[in-house]
């Protein structure tokens, strides 16, 4: 499936806030691996509304991808609550909150060329950014 737009819906704008969409391929183990796409320009999150990158990216059938969003500010974007997402598991045998989001701390605007997945450091029970895409 080819897409020509990917972006986020800003619900609370913050002056000078910016962000970028990222797409990672999965490794043979099914965890995030190499970076396939990093938005080439900052998305301006200083006003509300849909902000998008124009791109040419094709998702290949039968492959797993991880789509995310990195940002350099505190603007609020539309998100999907963690309880509405597929769970990766629980943090412990007594935990009630499913781990449903993968996250990594990076220095904006850089995204690592390899995600370097570590379950203990990257799994979280929280909302995930809602990245919207348009089919080309």
Locate the predicted segments by residue.
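A short beta-strand element within beta-rich, extracytoplasmic domains
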Residues: 1-13, 67
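Short, surface-exposed beta-strand/loop patches at domain edges
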Residues: 70-136
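Surface-exposed receptor/substrate recognition regions of extracellular proteins
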Residues: 1-2, 17, 103-105
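Intrinsically disordered, low-complexity regions of eukaryotic proteins
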Residues: 11, 44-46, 120
